[in-house]
Amino acid sequence: MKLVFAGTPEVAVPALDALIASGRHEVAAVVTRPDAPAGRGRRLVASPVAERAEEAGIEVLKPAKPRDPDFLERLREIAPDCCPVVAYGALLPRVALDVPARGWVNLHFSLLPAWRGAAPVQHALMAGDEITGASTFLIEEGLDSGPVYGTVTETVRPTDTSGDLLTRLAFAGAGLLAATMDGIEDGSLEAVPQPAEGVTLAPKITVEDARVDWTAPALRVDRVVRGCTPAPGAWTTFRGERLKLVQAVPLPDRSDLAPGQLAAGKNNVYVGTGSHAVELLWVQAQGKKPMRAADWARGARITEGERVGD
């Protein structure tokens, strides 16, 4: 089939690579978000998908909005059979959805209908899911509600961050998306409507969502830290400034600290929660680079009874 691939961040690149490598489909063009300012100099930088497409000699389209007339005209000229999508980053209007003969097919990083929305991996970790996965589905105008072509499952590991899990899902999902394109082309796949039961929502994680509540159980604190790493980053406050929690582990054998109470040893930093303590392994103080929590504690000269989160 002739394809136009839509995607923007690094997590979409494995799927683009899989489609290019398949040899069965022609990736005629790529649609991605416009170049965005990055770094200290705020220099405009192309998206990872745009860079990969340019390396492969594929035409790159960067509409400010997917309803732009010039973009729609070019899309109609290309006349794709199908448009696979991975983390494109903009809502597709009906006028765009109607262009490809076989629609737009999205790779979503959850087992639909669970975790519909912008942050499925983060929400799966924060909810304590033991199994998650990826789904391919036909895009409709509802939120991730279209009929599903296929799924792949992935076991959540005890130390997974959202970054770890998303990386694995990106590669597993790439194979799923390529197989979905094959099945659509040869007629062996039929999309199945999502069940009405089991729908959960995964809205974008806000900065406030990532703030650690030290009165919550240690297991919840652990899930928030892992679910919000690397972005937006779990955090608390210390002496009136924000402190990012990069890595922490629950300690079920220690329960002598009040919620938020700090205890610093030579090589360890502990914080009390609503159940037992957690050990902080890596933190990032405001305006600093990530560092070992023990090094941070020595520099901060933590005194007995000090707390985080006040």
Curated annotation (Swiss-Prot):
A Pfam match: Formyl_trans_N
Coiled coil region boundaries: none
Reactions catalysed according to its record: L-methionyl-tRNA(fMet) + (6R)-10-formyltetrahydrofolate = N-formyl-L-methionyl-tRNA(fMet) + (6S)-5,6,7,8-tetrahydrofolate + H(+)
Superkingdom in the source lineage: Bacteria
InterPro entries xrefs: Fmt, Formyl_trans_C, Formyl_transf_N, Formyl_transf_N_sf, Formyl_transferase-like_C_sf, Met-tRNA-FMT_C, Met-tRNA-FMT_N
Keywords: Protein biosynthesis, Transferase
Any one GO cellular component localisation term in the record: cytosol
Protein name: Methionyl-tRNA formyltransferase
Species: Streptomyces coelicolor (strain ATCC BAA-471 / A3(2) / M145)
